[in-house]
Structures are given as C-alpha cells and as structure tokens.
A protein has these predicted regions:
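Short, well-ordered beta-strand segments in beta-rich or mixed alpha/beta enzyme
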Residues: 33-42, 73, 79-106
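C-terminal segment of N-terminal export signals and the immediately downstream linker at the start
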Residues: 21-49
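A generic hydrophobic-segment detector
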Residues: 2, 18, 128-133
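An amphipathic, aromatic/His-enriched active-site/gating alpha helix that lines ligand/cofactor pockets
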Residues: 8-11, 56, 60-66, 86, ...
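Short, glycine- and small/hydrophobic-rich beta-strand elements in well-ordered beta-sheets
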Residues: 25-28, 61-89, 120-132
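N-terminal secretory signal peptides and thylakoid transit peptides that target proteins
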Residues: 1-16
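Short, conserved charged micro-motifs
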Residues: 46-51, 102-104
C-alpha cells in the first residue's frame, strides 16, 4: 500500500469511527432536560449599539446557578427557504436540568436586572420552552 492510499484508508477509517460518536440522539441523562429558547426583535434593528447592549445583557444570565449552558446568537446567513425565519435580531438558548431550575431563573435577581436594563431595547420577544423526550 503506498503512502497516499494508506493515508486515504486511515482517514476513511477515522471518519467512519467518528461517525458513530456524533449525530445520535442525546439521552436525557447526558444533557439538561429543559431548553428555554428566546428570540428578540429590536426596536432599532439596524443599531449595532443596541444589539451589543442586548448581547452584553444576555451574557450576564450565565451567572445564574440553575443555568447549565447558554448559547447567544444572531441570524445565520443560511439559504433562504420558506421555513426559515431570520427576522429576529438575536436569540438565546438556555439549558436547565428541569422546570424548577427554569422557574428559579425567572425569579433570579440577575434575570430581573437583565429585563430592567434591556427591555427598552426590544419590541417583541418570543419564547419556546421544550423538555427532552
């Protein structure tokens, strides 16, 4: 086997082995059971300053004890399709162990401060909460 075909063989073998470790369903025991996904539409959607303020406020939420993980993002430049809504300004996904953790988050002083500091920036908020099955 020459060096080039050996590398190809090893790369293919590694890719095959790796494929077994990704793409499967997450078990409820490995990941937090509740996802809190929030979409924000800014009053001034073209204001980079307002977006920066919102993102800075969202980042404070990771300090809350019951938050197991956080993802903050803006619309991706993916293919335009009828099922894709990229009209929002920013989104956050928070991960909790359970509903009690999400309830504690809602009442936490850091969350309340975030709302007090940033609610003037948005005109619309949509929340999707989901539990693992």
């Amino acid at each position: 086997m020459n060096r080039s075909s050996r590398r190809t063989f090893l790369a293919a073998g590694a890719a095959t082995a790796a494929a077994g470790t990704v793409g499967g369903e997450a078990s409820a025991s490995t990941y937090p059971r509740l996802v809190h996904h929030v979409f924000f539409w800014l009053k001034n959607p073209n204001s980079a300053e307002d977006l920066d303020k919102l993102i800075a406020g969202l980042r404070t939420l990771k300090k809350i004890d019951s938050v197991r993980g956080i993802h903050i993002g803006v619309p991706a430049s993916t293919e335009a399709r009828a099922v894709v809504d990229s009209s929002f300004s920013a989104s956050e996904i928070l991960f909790f162990d359970d509903v009690a953790g999400q309830d504690a988050y809602q009442e936490h002083p850091i969350h309340k401060q975030f709302v007090a500091d940033c609610s003037h920036l948005w005109e619309r908020v949509v929340v999707y909460d989901a539990v693992s099955v």
